[in-house]
């Protein structure tokens, strides 16, 4: 039978391996999945703890284990599943007998609710699959990446195949899970309940294909997802949008979105955050910040920096207004009393926010001082089932990246560097996540860091996380890195990727994308965690609030659009009666688009050919940027090209001119151009100043 070696070269990257294969005894080949199933689903290998691998799912899943010899951080931190507020959502969702999606901003408890629902279904004997489109969130609740679950390649560049190709790939993978893969992973056909997180990062085409394939495979063509119970969560404020993004084509604008998720719930409470700050965060999301709100936000954030005594007093006052010292945690942070965490915050200088472009340069050091360590499985570990081996190895490699656990891939820390802790340590460690410290000493296997706010100097070892499949526990991929974040690399995109970035000075001129203001403020606990300036310059720019998300959230929450009699439709640039706005919006985004170049409405079916006319091309002869619709006229009148190809051009060799005339190569045939991005053109002063002349 064919034997397949497990090697780590497919993950792409350089590894520092600490595994010495020569010193380890050679163990036999891995067990077959069918062999384990014959022994019984509850029988576990003797050298693993029973609670670690015990499962009621009926199929294999990825196990992510933290080595106790390193930093004992909990990257999952879903500690509030049994709270009364969480269980109320669980009871309502299970009693609805419908597919449910929970929407909300960061730290509103979405992931905790999903995990609690999944465990409640497992307690009832259901087969539950945990799936997420985000690698960090998939690791936190012990699930799969969606691409591995449905059998697609991990799409780094949004390379979406056609609908027919998607349907075929999903059906083929479901059949492989039942036959070739021997039930080592769940599939759309084998599970009873699907816990689906980060729907906002999913392409609408993939969701539509999942629905169609489930209807065929499960034999229920009239039911959404073929009768599969789906509990989903999404943060549509985190859509990858920018000010010039389209107003249509989003996943919540699918024609059958209401059929796929009949019950849509909006979570508005940001846990662990003061109520006054939460009010301003929601106003920032919906674009409702007034001049008084902006003044209050800037004044209260800077008040704790001017007077250290006022900071402590204000922190205690706000602590009584928080959502509770221990509550549902969506970002995984441990909720402790605000007065304890903010006691010494006024003594620490805030770190200035840098732009995303500057952060990329600082974040990608060519020769980092603390590179990540990746321990690969020994080469003599082999799988007798080639198909299973290829699939599982690929899944483990892509699920064991540093980004999947919220760790920094390459650190470049030296003595005196400012850092903050990414995860909570154990009780004896005495330092909570987000605490800012200074590196005092750099060792080979530990960093000595002093945390002045808690008056502690501790040795921070590397955090060791291993990933393996319970059917093949001998094959493990391990990553090691210090659970620290360099403070000089704090930028908007890094604040949204790596958690617990507090004590930051937010300059709104460094914010770049839509909803950046609300997304960053949602990560703060109190006004003492940040200072902010130039809010007015960012909040009133066109496109800084994502209009489709705002309308969708107000609709499912039954919020009034406004008190005005008419509403402005951003898609067709017209005023619509408030009572008919939702009906108009649904039809408008499916029928027309607005062309900003022509300032006119374009039917949606003609949008592609119309946009092609506005494509900018660069004339390689005269160096001018020309619209494609005007290219034909330009190529006949380009002065530089006419001078070059003209038979009277004395700078061209005579033989060249004769050949050009004999072969009929005139100026039009030799004229060349290349594609050109409109964003590369020089901007006017009005655009650079944000609308001010």
Curated annotation (Swiss-Prot):
Keywords: DNA damage, DNA recombination, DNA repair, Kinetoplast, Mitochondrion, Transit peptide
GO CC terms, sorted: kinetoplast; mitochondrion
InterPro entries reported for this sequence: Innate_Immune_Apopt_Reg, P-loop_NTPase
UniProt keyword annotation of Lipid metabolism present: no
Alphabetical GO biological process terms: DNA recombination; DNA repair; mitochondrial genome maintenance
Domain of life, per lineage: Eukaryota
Effect of inactivating the gene: Essential, it cannot be deleted.
Protein family per UniProt: Belongs to the helicase family. PIF1 subfamily.
Protein name: ATP-dependent DNA helicase-like PIF8
Gene responsible for this protein: PIF8
């Amino acid at each position: 039978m064919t034997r397949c070696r497990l090697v780590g070269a497919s993950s792409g990257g350089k590894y520092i391996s600490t595994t010495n294969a020569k010193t380890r005894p050679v163990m036999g080949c891995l067990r077959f999945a069918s062999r384990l199933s014959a022994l019984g689903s509850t029988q576990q290998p003797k050298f693993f703890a029973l609670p670690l691998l015990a499962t009621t799912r009926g199929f294999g899943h990825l196990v992510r284990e933290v080595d106790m010899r390193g930093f004992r951080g909990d990257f999952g931190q879903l500690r509030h599943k049994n709270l009364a507020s969480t269980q109320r959502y669980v009871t309502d969702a299970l009693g609805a007998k419908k597919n449910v999606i929970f929407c909300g901003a960061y730290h509103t408890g979405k992931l905790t609710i999903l995990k609690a629902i999944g465990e409640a279904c497992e307690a009832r004997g259901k087969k539950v699959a945990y799936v997420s489109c985000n690698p960090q969130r998939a690791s936190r609740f012990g699930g799969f990446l969606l691409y591995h679950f449905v059998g697609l390649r991990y799409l780094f560049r949004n390379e979406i195949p056609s609908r027919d190709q998607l349907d075929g790939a999903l059906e083929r993978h479901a059949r492989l899970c039942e036959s070739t893969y021997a039930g080592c992973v769940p599939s759309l056909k084998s599970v009873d309940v699907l816990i689906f997180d980060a729907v906002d990062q999913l392409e609408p085409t993939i969701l539509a294909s999942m629905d169609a394939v489930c209807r065929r495979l499960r034999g229920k063509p009239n039911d959404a997802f073929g009768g599969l119970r789906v509990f989903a969560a999404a943060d549509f404020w985190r859509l990858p949008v920018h000010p010039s993004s389209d107003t249509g084509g989003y996943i919540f604008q699918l024609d059958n979105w209401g059929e796929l998720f009949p019950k849509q719930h909006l979570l508005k409470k940001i846990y662990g955050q003061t109520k006054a700050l939460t009010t301003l965060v929601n106003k920032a999301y919906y674009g409702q910040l007034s001049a008084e709100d902006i003044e209050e936000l800037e004044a209260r954030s800077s008040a704790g920096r001017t007077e250290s005594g006022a900071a402590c007093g204000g922190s205690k006052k706000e602590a009584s207004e928080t959502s509770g010292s221990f509550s549902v945690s969506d970002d995984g942070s441990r909720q402790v009393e605000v007065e304890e965490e903010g006691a010494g915050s006024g003594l620490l200088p805030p770190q200035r926010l840098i732009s995303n472009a500057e952060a990329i340069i600082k974040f990608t050091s060519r020769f980092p001082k603390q590179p990540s360590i990746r321990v690969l499985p020994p080469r003599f570990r082999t799988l007798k089932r080639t198909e299973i081996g290829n699939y599982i190895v690929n899944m483990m490699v892509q699920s064991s990246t540093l980004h999947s656990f919220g760790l920094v891939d390459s650190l470049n820390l030296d003595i005196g560097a400012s850092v903050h802790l990414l995860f909570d340590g154990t009780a004896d460690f005495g330092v909570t996540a987000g605490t800012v410290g200074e590196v005092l000493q750099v060792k080979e296997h530990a960093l000595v860091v002093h945390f002045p706010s808690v008056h502690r100097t501790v040795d921070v070892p590397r955090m060791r996380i291993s990933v393996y499949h319970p059917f093949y526990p001998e094959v493990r991929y391990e990553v090691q890195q210090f659970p620290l974040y360099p403070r000089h690399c704090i930028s908007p995109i890094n604040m949204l990727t790596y958690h617990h970035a507090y004590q930051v000075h937010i300059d709104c001129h460094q914010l770049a994308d839509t909803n950046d203001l609300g997304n960053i403020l949602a990560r703060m606990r109190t006004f003492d965690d940040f200072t902010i300036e130039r809010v007015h310059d960012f909040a009133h720019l066109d496109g800084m609030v994502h209009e489709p998300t705002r309308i969708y959230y107000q609709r499912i929450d039954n919020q009034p659009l406004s008190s005005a009699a008419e509403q402005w439709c951003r898609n067709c640039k017209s005023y619509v009666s408030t009572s008919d706005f939702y009906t108009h919006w649904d039809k408008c985004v499916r029928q027309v688009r607005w062309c900003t170049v022509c300032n006119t409405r374009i039917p949606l079916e003609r949008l592609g050919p119309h946009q092609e006319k506005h494509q900018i091309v660069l004339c390689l002869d005269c160096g001018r940027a020309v619209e494609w619709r005007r290219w034909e006229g330009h190529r006949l009148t380009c002065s530089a090209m006419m001078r070059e190809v003209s038979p009277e051009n004395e700078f061209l060799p005579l033989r060249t001119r004769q050949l050009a005339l004999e072969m009929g190569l005139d100026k039009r045939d030799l004229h060349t151009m290349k594609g050109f991005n409109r964003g590369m053109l020089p901007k006017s002063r009005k655009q650079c100043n944000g609308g001010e002349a």
